[in-house]
Amino acid sequence: MRVGLFTNNYLPFRGGVTTAVETLRQGLEAQGHRAWVFAPAWRAPHDDPAFVFRYPSVPAPTYPGFALPLPFSRRWSRAARELDLDIFHAQHPFLLGVTARRLARSQGRPLVFTYHTRYEKYAHYVPLPEPLVASLAVRLASRFAGAADLVIAPSARIAESLADLGVKARIAVVPTGVPLDLFRPGDRGEARRTLGLDEDAPLCLYVGRLDREKSVERVIGAFGSIALAVSGARLLLVGQGSHEVALKRLAVASPASEAIRFAGSVAREELPPYYQAADLFLFSSETETQGLVLAEAHACGLPAVAVRASGVDEVVRDGETGLLTKADVEELADAAIGLLLDAPRRSAMALAARALAASDFSAARQVEVMAGHYRRLVGGPA
């Protein structure tokens, strides 16, 4: 099968959509299919492999470091025709997503759309009234989904919300998987030595973008209480984003400031030692469609304390692989303190977390499921 993946963000930009696209591309290639990525040009010169086609782009005015593709290119439209793609898979409902739809329709090929993002939660990036932008975003995304031949939802809750919005297209739940050979339990002491971390300190970890919608300030606030209750506790935050400066100011003002460290952006293939070194994963976002970093943490045998929210509660099994709380700093802190002080319970959750990741979030298995959907669309055996 020959698949075109059309995305508004891709490497070297890091985020959930980029990870999902690259996981799918690698998995398809590993299973004998061919996949090409159509993405915006990066802001700096960047060497790309032959499977990447870059559209001209402009800097996003409200998100430093993000490029917005100009979704018109005769050259790449011609390339898409010459590739003789079987499937056009859009990752967004606008810009290159619209390009994917146009090319799919002109060539009589199926259009697949993955609903990666709760777009109404990102309205603050558009310099217009947030309620207006949020409403328009929901309408645009649901209309685009309704025109697709298949809509992929990363979680059952997202599938339900799309149906509630009146999307009539067929919807399939296919979460982004985790490469289990990369993300796996490891030696905690060795991981800490590799990263230059104290081998004995109780370590809390956050991995993800440092953007407003991720509510990382709640993690930092909770850690202030954690540090008072758990002797020697440390917090390590991995990632970068538009809210980073504000979060660093918040960390400096925290009574636990000396115990908080920002590690910056880390390539996905270099993340496993961070998960392996930690004792507990902290997560407070309420805007996820899946919560991929939670699946990565679980694959490494790391339990999580997270705010109960759509997508998150389909990865973290409350009381089994971690704990889910209300969106409250002290409740988040209390749950984390309880687990940090209960090593046997944490160990049991670690085993359950790895088992859950292996059964429900294997990248190889999820790509196989996706390929089955592709085959049905082109009329082949599932």
What are these regions (language model features)?
Residues M1-R54:
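N-terminal subdomain of nucleotide-sugar transferases
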Residues A39, P56, A134, V138-R188:
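Donor nucleotide-sugar binding/catalytic pocket of nucleotide-sugar-dependent glycosyltransferases
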Residues A145, S265-V266, P273-A278:
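Short alpha-helical donor nucleotide-sugar binding micro-motif in glycosyltransferases
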Residues D198-G224, L236:
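Conserved donor-binding/catalytic core segment of Leloir-type glycosyltransferases
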Residues A246-V266:
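Nucleotide-activated donor-binding/catalytic signature segment of Leloir-type glycosyltransferases, i.e.
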Residues E286:
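Aromatic "clamp/platform" in nucleotide-sugar-dependent glycosyltransferases that forms part
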Residues R317-G319, L323-E330, G338-P344:
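Conserved acidic donor-binding segment of nucleotide-sugar-dependent glycosyltransferases
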